[in-house]
Amino acid sequence: MPPSPLDDRVVVALSRPVRPQDLNLCLDSSYLGSAAPGSTSHPPVIATTVVSLKAANLTYMPSSSGSARSLNCGCSSASCCTVATYDKDNQAPTQAIAAGTATTAIGSSTTCPASQMVNNSENAGSLSPSGGVGSPMAGTPKQLASIKIIYPNDLAKKMTKCSKSHLPSQGPVIIDCRPFMEYNKSHIQGAVHINCADKISRRRLQQGKITVLDLISCREGKDSFKRIFSKEIIVYDENTNEPSRVVPSQPLHIVLESLKREGKEPLVLKGGLSSFKQNHENLCDNSLQLQECREVGGGASAASSMLPQSIPSTPDIENAELTPILPFLFLGNEQDAQDLETMQRLNIGYVINVTTHLPLYHYEKGLFNYKRLPATDSNKQNLRQYFEEAFEFIEEAHQCGKGLLIHCQAGVSRSATIVIAYLMKHTRMTMTDAYKFVKGKRPIISPNLNFMGQLLEFEEDLNNGVTPRILTPKLMGVETVV
């Protein structure tokens, strides 16, 4: 349907949601006739009109099959039609009908026969979606377009200015897209962590079924993010310099794409955290700051208080030594499990191996009692299923007067989680207290967010009596804490 010469726009209702570039729009020129000499079947062409396609401001509405596009009219109908607006652009009269290609703004092209395409010799009939930036687009673009960057020095100036004015709430919202363990070790002050390391969360974010807000790891970050409409948003990962070269599978790409779909205009920190820390390490934190964390899809409940806020420096995981958590309970890594001399010196007679692949070192010598808990350090691993089995083995070592070494690959996540749970079981420590206690002994610990969620659920069961605590005999070495 061509635009009316009396109107500036034509509104077309479509029966289903479509992308503007999928409409293959071309004006029906059959009524104009041919400009060929001697033709009498149609009147001569006296003018042409070039139209541009604009997507209406659409919003996501729920449906049984996921998110559906619908009008931004406040209705709750998932079947509400999609509206596209065609604005007329009057051009100078011309006598020619040119066959051409209608090229969309994102690079795809559609070729129409000459009899179906009205064109202008100066301007191609471009169908460019130029509506609101929040207009959803089906599919994933190969590259991020028009993403701006911010340099480390500029971000540092903004942060310093807000700090001096004592108005941190007026500063930019900073989003960390790196894995949670890396965020735990070091991050820019005030940055909120986006937990999209697992495939399920990434896919749901790409599909628009969840938003960036849903993946923020702490309540404080969520509250800050809700107030970003008048703020800058700065996103960073470890070392990205060119956002346009980030591949679609990377968390940075997914977060940026989601933010733009929500109508935001995020900036990317050039060079990421690595570049920022070179000159502004004083504006970075080296600790876990986690309030009411939860794993999306993991069912973790909220934490009751804040975990430790600072440690002297970034822990050296590779050079960490075997750590005595209690007089009889030691937390270590793969190398510690191989150190026969140290284990014998510490009277260790029991070993818990919390991996699926590391061997039971020295098993053939018959010097130790071994237990393997086959677990991976992933967001899907159910580690809680091994808690009671591990507790019984630890108690057996304790009653026999022997030390016990619990280890995984690095003594950071899996084995640390079980030690924290053991302290919660045998004392009145909260999850936060137990975490602080173990972190104070071994600063490198960093249970992944999935395991933190399981510890929170375990704490809830302990408090509700679903899982009983064992408080006698009292553990030695924690009297000043409990």
Swiss-Prot record:
Protein phosphatase involved in the inactivation of MAP kinases. Has a specificity for the MAPK11/MAPK12/MAPK13/MAPK14 subfamily. It preferably dephosphorylates p38. Residues 168-285 form the Rhodanese domain. The active site is at C408 (phosphocysteine intermediate). Residues 199-215 are annotated as: Interaction with MAP kinases. One of its GO terms (molecular function) is MAP kinase tyrosine phosphatase activity. Belongs to the protein-tyrosine phosphatase family. Non-receptor class dual specificity subfamily. Residues 321-464 form the Tyrosine-protein phosphatase domain. It comes from Bos taurus. Monomer. Interacts with MAPK14. This is Dual specificity protein phosphatase 10.
